[in-house]
Curated annotation (Swiss-Prot):
Highly expressed in flowers and at lower levels in roots, leaves, stems and siliques. Belongs to the protein-tyrosine phosphatase family. Atypical dual-specificity phosphatase Siw14-like subfamily. It comes from Arabidopsis thaliana. The keyword Transferase does not apply. GO terms for biological process: defense response; regulation of defense response to bacterium. The lineage of its organism: Eukaryota, Viridiplantae, Streptophyta, Embryophyta, Tracheophyta. This is Inositol diphosphatase DSP4. Residues 1-23 are annotated as: Disordered. Signal peptide: none annotated.
Amino acid sequence: MTLESYAGDVHTVPQSENSMEERGGGELFVPPLNFAMVDNGIFRSGFPEPVSFSFLQSLRLKSIIYLCPEAYPEVNREFAKSNGIQVFQFGIERCKEPFVNIPDEVIREALQVLLDTENHPVLIHCKSGKHRTGCLVGCVRKIQRWCLSSIFDEYQRFAAAKARISDQRFMELFDISNLKHTPLSFSCSKRYTNTIDY
């Protein structure tokens, strides 16, 4: 089985036994843990291991948003450098405590990078691709005017049994009023609107 993602929806697709083996030049394409497409040019995942580098190359990434405070491993830095990928690090501490707040200002800085289409295609990741990544994606969804129940559903699809009330509260209370409200050029609704002739 493999997972295909379309704007946050995860679908299971049956595969033949050999379908993960050779693609094109005989390389193995293995997506990182919790990989999904958020929107056109925006992807999310857990920490990319070297086995996923060929897959990531196929995305032709321009940028990576890394949401952990730990130094980026040398092998990942070399991969980014050799592929012309700029890495933006926003160190958000891993937190399991229920009343510890996610740093609002760090999420805002990460959003500025994420919303700049010059940085697309971009991969957002933390260690597991659940909590920190889920909060940043949830804030993007608020900007895209998703309702809270849909934002929480998407968050819970990735966090599963480890969903945190504190993360959901952060997304609910995150104030988007002072963010630049230009149409998001990567959003599906804008893309379809531009193709209609009146």
